[in-house]
Every structure is written in C-alpha cells, then in structure tokens.
C-alpha cells in the first residue's frame, strides 16, 4: 500500500513539473503612447492554441539567421559638450541610462570618428596631423581627444557603465593628402603609405589610452559626400597598404570596408572592392548608412552575395542636410516618433544587419551644437535629432521615442543573440524573435496602429495571447 501511494505521489509530482515546464511563463516589457516606458508586466504564459480573431505570429527557433553584434549610437564632441553642462551627478545618471545593461539601455555597439566631422564642435576643424608633408607622422597628436570634451574622454566615461564594440570611420584625411581641398578632394595616391601610417598611429595612440578600436572603417561616406575617393582607389588603399600594415602591426583591430551614405550606393559600389579576393580578405564587416530610408533590398542582395561578412548599419538620423523636410521641427520630442525608428530597425534586421547604430546620441534643444567647415561639408545651420535631448537653459533631460524603441533592442537583444524565424503579418503590427546566448527567447512586438491590438504569438505548439497598446513596442522574454 505504501509503495502504491508513493508511486501515485511521484506520478502527480512529475505531471505538475511537466505542466509547469510547458506553461512557459512570459515576462513582458512595454513602452507605449499611453505612458509605459520599459514597464515590466506579467505576460502570462503559453497555453494551448485556440482559434481567435487576433493578429497571429509564429516563432520557429530551429531556423537561424544573423548573429547580433549590438545596438547603439555615436560618441561625438557635441554630445559630451552638452552633457558636461549638467551637474556631475546628473551627467553620470544620463550615461548610466544609456550604457548600463541592467539599470539602463545597455548600448552595445558604438561609433566614434577619426577627428573632424560635423559634430566635433569643441574647436575648429582638425585632423591628427595638420602639418603639410609630415609623412612620418612626427607631429601626430590626439591631444584634443583627451580633453574634457574629447572623444577618448567620452569613450572612457561611457565604458564605466557597460562594455560595447567600437567602430571608427574617417570623414577626411589631413588636407595635405588631398589633391586640392577646394577643387579636388580625392586622396593623392602618393600619400597612401602615409595614410596607412596615419590610421595605425590613431589605433596605437588610442590603445595607449586603454581604448582598443574594434573596427576601423577607412572612409565615412566617401566619393559622393566627403573625401571624393572612388571605390577603385579604396580597393588599392585597402589591399596594398592598410590591410598589410594592420596585419603587421600586432593590433587586434579589424577593418570595415568604408561607409556609403545610402543602402543603394552600398549595393552599387561595394562589389568593386569585395569582388577582389586580395582586398576582400582584409574586410571583416560591411558597414552602410541608411540616409535613403529605402532600398533595403540592396542590403539583402549584399548579404546573399557575401554571406560570411556581417552587415552593420552604422549611421542614420533626422537631419535637414540629409533630406528631412523643413516642415518637421528638430529635434523631435514626441514619443510617437519612436514608431518610425522601430520600423527602420526591424527593416534593417530583416535584411541581415547584425548591428544598428544611430548618429548623435546627445544634442541640445536646438539640435546642436554643430561644427562649421563648409569646405569639409559641414554647413551652418545643421540641426539634427539625437537619442537624448538636454536643454541647455532648463537642464531638462528628454529621452526621445527613439531612445525607448532602440532600448528595447539594446537591452534585451544582447550581443551574441541570434535572430530566428518569425512568420505572420498584419498591417501596422510586426514581430521579430531572437534566442540569446543564455538560451532565453526574446520577441519584439510592435503595434503601429492608433488602437490596441490583440495578438497571438505561437511557439512550439503553444500560444501566447497579448494585448499590444496603441503605438507601442513590447518585448516578451521566456525560457526555451
């Protein structure tokens, strides 16, 4: 009798364990037009599937796509200048909100720049060696980057709160390396060895400061926007100069091809470099910018042609100079604007992007300050939209809709996560899923409609029923 009772108890216990395991409790995090801001909620659990009129999606974690490298924005002088205007404790609070993976967004992929660009506003236009003809880099200096508003300082302060991959492109080399800064901004090939030396010195000087640049991108928006070097010459510089120089240097930095301003331009010009095996062997990542806000198919095609190379979307923003209509007031404070950016992030991820990096992380209430150097393509005015707005008069810190939508990805889809197959579609409602390094499932659910939407998320024969608030992003997490 005792044995029979024990057997019944054991069977019941096992059944309870099975039922509990199959329930798969879900944690939900919501940001919405109604006022939720990464708000934690119980998401219920996966249950037996039932027919309903809800929008339906299905997750298949047996089908894997790209590995995620990270999400973030750019570290530039203008942002640190604005941040430094706050009391020190509040400065640290802002940095924590951006980089701390537990208490903040956990930004995990960041961009900086080699010297001058349009938001290096702590001084006049500069490079690291502005002494004409100094091919041996005897006057090379990163002194400005070490100042209170400098990029090296910014990077160090950010890394107090979290780790992140760091990539760095260059708008222009020193003017004396160009044929003519006013009339022909192409690089004179006789300076290719000196330019390779310039890149290496930058990496070495930053390493001496405890900062290893993970990826160096030869040029930022070359040929059509900044340095007017054609891709045929970028191929030569990469293949015959910079690639071999970096290989001999002992540095662990890897190379990115260069960063086209638009997806369409990337699709058109990148094969000039990548179809040369001797040049391609030095390329670790294919970066591109998103200023056309379309042509995602061109990135999908690059992914099909060069499947072994990760794709990074490394710059995008609202900017009048980049085509944002003047009827839109910049910067944008409305939370609802985040929906636009959430869709852009999903679009890039769907065509294979492994990282997504916005341009200015912090700016003031005027969308600045910006640097002015017309000859280098830095106009005045140049208002842009950041992730975080800090009012220089009131000292109010405003976290934009972009901040929250981007945070749903950076906080929950950590580096090493893999995007998995998610099917189902409905106008204005989207879903995308990932499996993390720890084996946790993450689903991002976006509702772009102006009314609440019921949704079902299917997984391994079960179904999760959730209510998606109007204009919202919801992150669901559960154990596999």
Language model: regions and residue ranges:
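Bacterial Sec-dependent N-terminal signal peptides
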Residues: 1-25
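N-terminal catalytic cores of secreted or lumenal carbohydrate-active enzymes
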Residues: 38-213, 236, 240
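Glycoside hydrolase catalytic-domain groove-lining segments
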Residues: 142-147, 151-153, 244, 252-255, ...
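Active-site cleft segment of glycoside hydrolase catalytic domains centered on the general acid/base Glu
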Residues: 172-276, 295-304
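Aromatic/acidic polysaccharide-binding cleft in carbohydrate-active enzymes
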Residues: 313-405, 421-424
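Carbohydrate-binding surface patches
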Residues: 408-412, 422-460, 467, 471
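C-terminal beta-strand-rich structural cap/linker in extracellular carbohydrate-active enzymes
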Residues: 468-480
